[in-house]
């Protein structure tokens, strides 16, 4: 009897919510998908951005809603109301006024960003006015499909797709690691010459396709011609960081055991492998160098993501109890101007990604650093509502604390790593990445590691001056020349 009463109460509660909540009805056209859809449907609303799907997640003000559906046929509507997962408020609690609105149906075919994943279905932007009447509803038809990107090759810029058995086995489908290869001008002029390879890992959101357009600079470090390989690391859950993980799969092993041998078989490489990257790319190349130390000659890491989890933004993950608030109850910044003045906060960044659920920065960290949970998703570093840190999850993150790893294992690693690593960063980094770098610097001093740390004026973006980049290239060129001398002995 009690179970029956509870069931009836639940039914009436759902009925009441549906009856008195703001509703959006979303469908997709048969031309965009000619079969039933199972997955997540997202709604993006913005007061300022005429194309809400292009908004910078966690930075631009945005209302987001998501529902999970099964077997929805073309033309059949899905209702998004107060039962949806919502940020920052439920549909009925939204401020009344004028909004731009778009919907997207996520087929999750492997692309990183939901709004830009090839195959996903989305609606044209609409301008709507949400009034006081909650019975007012809005209808959207998704009839656009995100197209596959086409790589435009030139004489010196080529696309390279390496089949990966390791990642194919993990994802249970055919999988390739994709890159853009920029050849030096000397490659065709001297057909017998072999060249060092410079692997460039892009930052979060970077894409190797762009190199077909932007790869205009000569493929050199200093005056040394190189084969430059642009790796973007994009995967369905974010940036793979080329680290083996429970959620993304064995990206590090796939790159080193499968991609690199195939690349060196196809192009005239001389065996010298150099690494560089900025931001998430900066973290990735440090990870690769420190975990495959004999494979790479040198690494120049620029403004790497958090290399010491005692400073994950403004949070000490090992001692602090809350990701959103500091000990005085103040919001922890997620992004700053000049490293001092917040323009976003971790709470809003994390909570909006709790709705969007995959492919953005905070979720990307979890996909790399966390174990896979019982629900098949990466374990959360914190409670998405309160910000309380899950110390059980932090235990797994420790494996990816590069500073901690080097400190604890330097005795065994020193022979293969001494002199190979240079880290540079701006002293006013927007995401406060300079603080964990300085902590790592102190740890490396303590173990007497031969490792260069260089600090420059500027933030995450303005730091990359001509002089900054010249210093970075100079280090790599010098290390390469030392490698050549060793090889001749």
What are these regions (language model features)?
Residues 40-48:
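Residue-level hotspots within well-ordered secondary structure
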Residues 31, 47-489:
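Non-catalytic cap/lid and distal C-terminal segments of serine-dependent acyl enzymes
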């Amino acid at each position: 009897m009690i179970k029956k009463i509870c069931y009836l109460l639940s039914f009436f509660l759902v009925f009441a919510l549906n009856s008195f909540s703001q509703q959006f009805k979303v469908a997709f056209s048969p031309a965009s998908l000619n079969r039933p859809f199972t997955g997540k449907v997202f709604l993006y609303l913005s007061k300022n951005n005429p194309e809400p799907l292009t908004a910078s997640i966690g930075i631009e003000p945005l209302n987001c809603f998501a529902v999970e559906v099964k077997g929805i046929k073309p033309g059949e509507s899905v209702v998004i109301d107060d039962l949806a997962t919502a940020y920052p408020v439920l549909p009925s609690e939204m401020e009344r006024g004028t909004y731009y609105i778009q919907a997207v149906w996520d087929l999750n075919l492997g692309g990183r960003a939901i709004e830009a994943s090839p195959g996903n279905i989305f609606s044209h932007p609409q301008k709507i006015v949400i009034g006081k009447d909650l019975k007012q509803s809005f209808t959207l038809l998704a009839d656009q499909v995100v197209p596959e990107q086409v790589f435009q090759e030139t004489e010196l810029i080529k696309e390279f797709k390496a089949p990966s058995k390791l990642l194919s086995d993990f994802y249970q489908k055919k999988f390739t690691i994709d890159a853009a290869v920029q050849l030096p001008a000397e490659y065709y002029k001297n057909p017998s010459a072999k060249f060092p390879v410079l692997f460039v890992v892009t930052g979060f959101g970077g894409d190797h396709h762009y190199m077909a357009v932007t790869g205009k600079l000569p493929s050199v470090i200093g005056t040394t011609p190189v084969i430059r390989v642009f790796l973007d690391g994009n995967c369905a859950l974010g940036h793979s960081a080329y680290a083996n993980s429970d959620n993304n799969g064995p990206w590090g092993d796939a790159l080193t055991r499968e991609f690199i041998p195939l690349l060196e078989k196809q192009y005239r490489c001389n065996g010298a492998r150099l690494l560089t990257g900025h931001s998430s790319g900066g973290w990735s190349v440090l990870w690769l160098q420190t975990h495959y130390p004999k494979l790479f000659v040198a690494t120049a890491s620029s403004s790497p993501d958090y290399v010491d989890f005692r400073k994950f933004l403004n949070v000490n993950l090992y001692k602090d109890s809350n990701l959103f608030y500091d000990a005085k109850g103040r919001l922890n910044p997620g992004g700053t101007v000049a490293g001092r003045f917040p323009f976003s906060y971790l709470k809003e960044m994390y909570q909006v990604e709790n709705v969007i659920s995959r492919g953005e920065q905070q979720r990307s960290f979890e996909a790399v650093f966390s174990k896979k949970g019982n629900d098949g998703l990466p374990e959360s570093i914190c409670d998405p509502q309160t910000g309380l840190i899950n110390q059980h999850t932090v235990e797994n993150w420790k494996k990816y604390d590069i500073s901690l790893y080097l400190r604890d294992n330097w005795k065994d690693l020193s022979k293969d790593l001494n002199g190979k690593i240079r880290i540079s960063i701006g002293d006013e980094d927007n995401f406060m990445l300079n603080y964990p770098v300085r902590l790592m610097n102190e740890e490396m001093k303590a173990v007497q590691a031969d490792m260069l740390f260089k600090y420059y004026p500027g933030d995450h973006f303005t730091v990359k001056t001509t002089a900054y980049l010249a210093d970075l290239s100079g280090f790599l060129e010098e290390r390469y020349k030392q490698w050549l001398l060793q090889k001749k002995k």
